[in-house]
Amino acid sequence: LGYELNPLDGKSNPISPPFSIWIDSDVAHGRATLGWQYEGPPATVHGGFVCAIFDQFLGIAQLITGQPGVTGTLTTRFHRPTPLNVELKLIGRVKDVKGRKNILTGEIWANDVMTASCEGLFIHISKERFLQMRKADG
C-alpha cells in the first residue's frame, strides 16, 4: 500500500522509516521504528513526525470504510514522549461514517504505554477525482 516515494512508507524514499501497516477485519495495525533523524526533544520523536505517522496510518486505515478519502482534520493528543529506536505499535479504528466523512481514531504505543492518540476526519473523493489529482501530479 502507498506510493513508492512516499516520505512515510515509500520503499524507495531514503527518509522513510521502517513502517508497516495491515488491516485485520475492522482494526488497522501498524509497526514503526523511528531513529535519530526523527528526534525532537532529547531521545524522543518530534511531534510533527508523530502527526505525520498518524496521517499516513489513518489514511490507509480508512480503507476499512470502503470509501477512502483525503485528510480534513487531524487532532493529536500527546500523552507521553514517544521514544526513538523503539518499535511503536499503532492501532486504528473507524469511529463513524457520515456520508462522505470518515472519522477514525488512532493510538501509538511504545513498550505497552500509549504515547499519543488522535482523531482524524477524512473526506471521501471519487476515484475519478483521485485520478485527476494523480494526472496533474505528472
Please report, for each region that a protein language model flagged, where it lies by residue:
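Active-site helix/loop of acyl-thioester processing domains in fatty-acid/polyketide metabolism
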Residues: 22-27, 45-68
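Hydrophobic beta-strand-centered segment that forms part of the acyl-chain substrate-binding groove
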Residues: 56-89
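HotDog/MaoC-like acyl-thioester-processing domains
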Residues: 82-84, 95-138
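Short, surface-exposed charged micro-motifs
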Residues: 18-20, 91-94, 119
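Non-catalytic linker/capping segments at the edges of enzyme domains
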Residues: 1-31
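Short histidine-centered catalytic/ligand-binding loop motif
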Residues: 34-48
